[in-house]
Amino acid sequence: MAVETGTSGISTQFQRYFSKELLDYIVESLQLVQFAQKAPLPAKSGSKTIRWFRFDEPSTGAIETLSNEGVKPTGERALSLENVDADLVQYGQVISITDILQLTELFSHVEQAVKVTGQDAALHADKIVRNELGSNVTGKQTRMANGLADYAAVGAASAADAVVEFNDFLDCTTQLRKNNTPMIGGNYVGVVSPEVASDLMKTSGWQNAASYSAVESLYKGEIGRLWGIRFLQTTVPFLSDGSTQHTYDSSGTVHSSFVFGQNAYGVSDVASQSPYGPSVYVTDGASKDDPLNQKTVVGYKSFYAAKTLQPKYYVEMYSKTNFS
């Protein structure tokens, strides 16, 4: 009987081949920061607080009928200046990479650390804006999907009874127009979760972005339009549990969709510590804390704040979703 030698008998000589083509990893779709009013804080300004100003709304209360010729009005219209303050907070993150890892690595961990640090900074900044809009802002406009009475009713309802309907976002547009909210490029902007977007796309009046992209430039992440609102998807939506209205819950079933016009909210823009284009520091070399140069440290820092500037200029729509 012939003896045949195959790979199974000498399998210990074979080693794994490692592909140097890295697989893609999940990167969140972020939308809110691009529509914020950005306020610079110059270096050596003597403050850690940014203050936005606005004059009071137009009013006819001081206009008088002048019954007698040559007689001036008896009263005067007073101007008042309102302000909104935001205290900046410093944030930071570091990634330490050992010399042994760098000596034996298949991939450049320093290069990847720089890349992921920038993505982490952008994600963190967007979450700060999201949490500000979803917080208990005085005077915020809210709407409930499917004609439900209030947030508690949305929380108690089934998904089918709390899903967004065709006319729900018309109410958002109407509310903003009633408040004289300035538009952004002739439309309002809506930022929704992918699940709510799925529900919206099934409504009869939905207009896909592809149908008007030839004549209008699209925002990053834009998916379509309805009732004068251009919708964008975010994968980091504000979720809540149906009982605690203004508290983010990653496993919450109530989705907050934000519809807004111009200057609804603002963020700081400190050139040297901005999370949008952060300065990433790579520290290498022996020091008192690392005398043998055993670590390379990659990190960033930001000095940042987000604030609602005019609560009348945005609407938070609460809903559930049929997506499962």
Show which residues each predicted segment covers:
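Beta-strand elements of well-folded, non-transmembrane domains
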Residues: 56, 99, 302-306
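Short, solvent-exposed loop/turn segments at the edges of secondary structure
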Residues: 88-90, 185, 293
